[in-house]
Amino acid sequence: MQIQFKLNGKMVNEETEPNETLLDFLRERLNVTSVKKGCDEGECGTCTVLLNGEPVRSCLLLSVQMRGTDEVTTIEGLAKAGEMSDVQEAFLEKYGFQCGFCTPGMILTAKALLDENPRPTVQEIKDQLEGNLCRCTGYEQILESVQRAAELRAARR
């Protein structure tokens, strides 16, 4: 079955199987390994991508659900011209990662929040990141990273 959609700004036109998840399609057919396979049940958030700007669990979507007008963004799609995005920069600055397994999903979820709400409260950040699990950091540095990203965005406006 042929599908077509935009991935990080570039059109993808590929064959897929009717039962293939978007997660497996991205990892196995397109070699986008930043999208992690964690629980495979939509509970951990490591497979998070942005679909038309909204965070979604790619393990819960079938690749055949993608349409020509859909845009999927992975962590690779955030850096422009070799420059890290404000959220990536903030995570690096505030050490909002440790092993890195959850980091792409955290960053994409944080980006979606800041796109919608440029000055979130700590509680709003916690609420948005609720479905993204981290086993390493204890979340404090992740929260600080999102707050710092909001500051960076405000300073650049």
Features from the language model and the residues they span:
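Signature of N-terminal electron-transfer/Fe-S-associated modules in redox systems
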Residues: 1-157
